[in-house]
Amino acid sequence: MELEVFAGQEKSELSMIEVARAILELRGRDHEMHFSDLVNEIQNYLGTSNSDIREALPLFYTELNFDGSFISLGDNKWGLRSWYGVDEIDEEIIALEENDDDEVAPKAKKKRVNAFMDGDSDAIDYNADDPEDEDAYEADPALSYDDENPDDEKNEVEAYDAEINEIAPDDLGEDVDLNEDDDEFSDDDAETSEE
């Protein structure tokens, strides 16, 4: 493979980043490369030995990440940032992640073993019915509180009033009703209550 960009230059003077950029530009937008394939192409172009490539690999990977012209597309696939608009970058990465999610099988839950219960058939295993261990736990809709439902607030106020009436002294002889309009306490009220 010959890269016209480097015509007339010594291959030994080229950096791996420069060669990687040229290789990706030559391949084009829809031909992203896996990291290992990119390294193999660079090695073939530069004609370096396996030991030299292995020695330069950590620095090359670091430069690939820090150089602003490359972008990781997930799955260790690399492309040029100039190929993608800002919105497309997120779409490409999300599409790759969705493909990965389809391939991953759900993990099986590990069963806990209690060493003290092995020989005892009469023992009760309290871990067997723990509702927090269930993945498909659904809340009871009757127990949920809806901010939008005015009946919930009305029920709360009625329950609160009933509790206050239970606590009120019996010598009052009547239910205590709270008047929300009398929230302010004036000085005149203070004098009459002291007398």
Curated annotation (Swiss-Prot):
GO cellular component, one term: DNA-directed RNA polymerase complex
Keyword Transferase appears in the UniProt entry: yes
Gene Ontology BP, a term: DNA-templated transcription
PROSITE patterns, per the entry: HTH_HARE
Region (Disordered): 120-195
Keywords, ordered alphabetically: DNA-directed RNA polymerase, Nucleotidyltransferase, Transcription, Transferase
Highest taxon in the source lineage: Bacteria
Skewed-composition ranges (Acidic residues): 120-138, 145-195
Residues of the HTH HARE-type domain: 14-83
One GO MF term attached to the UniProt entry: DNA-directed RNA polymerase activity
InterPro entries to which the protein is assigned, alphabetical: Asxl_HARE-HTH (IPR007759), RNAP_delta_N_dom_sf (IPR038087), RpoE (IPR029757)
Pfam families: HARE-HTH (PF05066)
Quaternary structure, from the entry: RNAP is composed of a core of 2 alpha, a beta and a beta' subunits. The core is associated with a delta subunit and one of several sigma factors.
Protein family (similarity comment): Belongs to the RpoE family.
Functional description taken from the UniProt entry: Participates in both the initiation and recycling phases of transcription. In the presence of the delta subunit, RNAP displays an increased specificity of transcription, a decreased affinity for nucleic acids, and an increased efficiency of RNA synthesis because of enhanced recycling.
Descriptive protein name: Probable DNA-directed RNA polymerase subunit delta
Organism per entry: Streptococcus pneumoniae serotype 2 (strain D39 / NCTC 7466)
